[in-house]
């Protein structure tokens, strides 16, 4: 292309060169002289500048081109008259072409360039970050290597220091021995010189002795030196062994860290093998060319079978380059069936050969030459086994990495027959683990109850506010506990109780002028031990009620023990002081004997004489209780989820499970989700002790709640949880855990139970089904009935529950032939009718000791009667007659008592019993008689005994059965 100068362009445009130069410079083109070259791009830029300077925009017509196309056609169409007409049809098509904006394209390209630059910058930053991380990793590895080197150097320095100290000690011992020998030699020389004038012979003897001692000293020094050399040699040997072990460990680590071998092409493999043959190794040195040629010739032939491992390995090496797996030559050699044809490799695979099935050589494979011959030590692996509360035999074997049959064998050795799916309890499983050489730990895994601890810790920082004291009234039966509470509460509970005794634990709160007090009334009967223990567990202060006319009784002592075990203070209320025979001083002395000291004797228990009948001393008693509470400084969080204790629980036919809750901390509200043992639910209704609805209950306030899934066990802890799903999960977990633990313990005790039944023999059992109104009464009644069991008659509680007697209870009694006991409950109409049809005995009681007495009487009737022997007469044989077909007939005289027909007799000869049997016949003269009295003669014969002699004495007796009692 010909170049154009400024002057030529000015001539073409009919302008002066100076004016064109001014315009070029204004357009940003550095043209100074008319001889400067003007390119096409310069012309374009100049044209754009001139357009902008004159205000001319780009012509839109040049960017937008419209193409119009017309097509004309004819259509023949008939009209209504039948004539054909020709219609001209014109079709117009319009197409618009828009030129793309170059500026927009440039902007797009610029954006793309910016994006590419940003991506490149990000990639560069990532690379720099990776380099920094690699540098940090290298620095960390170098620091670790340096630390290891420094530790090794410190260890080596310590070892050298110890060795030098040992050598110094040995040198010092040798010097001491040598110095001692020299001193002894000097002393000997002095003695020899002194004695030389006296006797030369004596001097010679002395010199000989000194020589012997010197030899002994020299020998001792030599022995010490030899011992030092031996110790040094042992240290060197130990150091060498340690270094060898470390080197071997490093080699093993390098082998484990080495990259995996990959299959290579045959040419690469041959080159490597050729190089290896030229270099050689420690175990396979370089062979001369003649030996290599000999081996190559020998490799063309089939190798002979041999029985030694070395020959087999050498032959495998001579086979050429087809020994490695993964090569094509190896596949062809396998197809041809070439290879060693032996009956088996006695080396156990050390030579690298594995025989095929049935000894065929075609399936043999040569092992990889790079495989190490190192074998790990076969020491037994001791595992740490975490054993849950219940575990099956299969799961236990899996945890120990052994087969289940090994665990079953071990259990058989321990004397227990198990199956692979049998569930073991934690104690048995831990014994098996220890017996098999592993370490057993009690596991607490996957326990949803761990969530309760976390939830409880979240509310520990709540504000602690004072709370009312919880006071438990305890004492012996009929000492006036409930009457005392009735006077305080201005109520009459005792009058409505069956038999005048308390059989339920009651919770009340009383508002006094000095504050609120919560009372727990416990039964005093001996059967309610667990109920009293629960009362002591939930209490802050114990009021011990002792009757002034009765003194300390067994349940009084038990209440003292419960209070001391719970660590709560005791306030003694000496009741019934209004009686004429009241003796408070005697009560004090008896309580002092039980380690309950009054304050006037220097103790810490206030004694208050009261009368529940007249109300004397009640105010003083409440004042002492509040004083004790003030000393204890009882506080509890109020604005927190509630916690409490199940005081009592029962099953109502219309309301369902009902639980009496004593709130210990927090506030229980209606609608809260509660968890009590294995029972859970949402609080649907909440009543106070008077049966009035309430919306919330604070600390130390007793309430009755409804809405639980089942009747909770009395004494269970009550918690409020945030959602019902978590409560249901924990409740189901507790139910399953209780069921699994119970089942596992039953299985573990099967063998023991079997042995007990074998030793017991035939034992009478009295099956019972117990239904009570509340949980505490049912628990107390069951415990009292089970205590009645003896070695001959055993009480079997088939089922115990809370609520009315239902048809399912009657069906269970029919199947188990049991007697149903209802304590403060009745059977519904359907259950009564079903019991009459099946003849099931249902007994109703409302006083616990009435039930215990009747069951005791029934058990007495089941006892086998006692047989007692009573002597009724003595007979003397005077003469013996031998009667054919009858045998011996004794003529006798009744000397004492009387003789009855068919009586039992004992034949005594010289006061020795020779026969015990029964009379066959009894006659007086020729007549059969029923009995013969003292002083009369009679004739008699004994069944199956004819050796009656004159002078024998017959002792006549009878056995009577006497009914026994428990």
UniProtKB/Swiss-Prot annotation:
Residues 304-315 have a biased composition (Low complexity). Residues 99-382 are annotated as: Disordered. Residues 611-613 are annotated as: G5. This is Translation initiation factor IF-2. Residues 475-482 are annotated as: G1. It is found in: Cytoplasm. GO terms for molecular function: GTP binding; GTPase activity; guanosine tetraphosphate binding; translation initiation factor activity. One of its GO terms (cellular component) is cytosol. PROSITE patterns: G_TR_2 (PS51722), IF2 (PS01176). Residues 346-359 have a biased composition (Gly residues). Keywords: Cytoplasm, GTP-binding, Initiation factor, Nucleotide-binding, Protein biosynthesis. Belongs to the TRAFAC class translation factor GTPase superfamily. Classic translation factor GTPase family. IF-2 subfamily. Pfam families: EF-G_D2, GTP_EFTU, GTP_EFTU_D2, IF-2, IF2_assoc, IF2_N. InterPro entries: DNA-bd_dom_put_sf (IPR009061), EF-G-like_DII (IPR053905), EFTu-like_2 (IPR004161), IF2_assoc_dom_bac (IPR013575), IF2_II (IPR044145), IF2_N (IPR006847), P-loop_NTPase (IPR027417), Small_GTP-bd (IPR005225). One of the essential components for the initiation of protein synthesis. Protects formylmethionyl-tRNA from spontaneous hydrolysis and promotes its binding to the 30S ribosomal subunits. Also involved in the hydrolysis of GTP during the formation of the 70S ribosomal complex. GTP binds at residues 475-482, 521-525, 575-578. Residues 466-635 form the tr-type G domain. It comes from Cupriavidus pinatubonensis (strain JMP 134 / LMG 1197). The gene is infB. Residues 500-504 are annotated as: G2. Residues 575-578 are annotated as: G4.
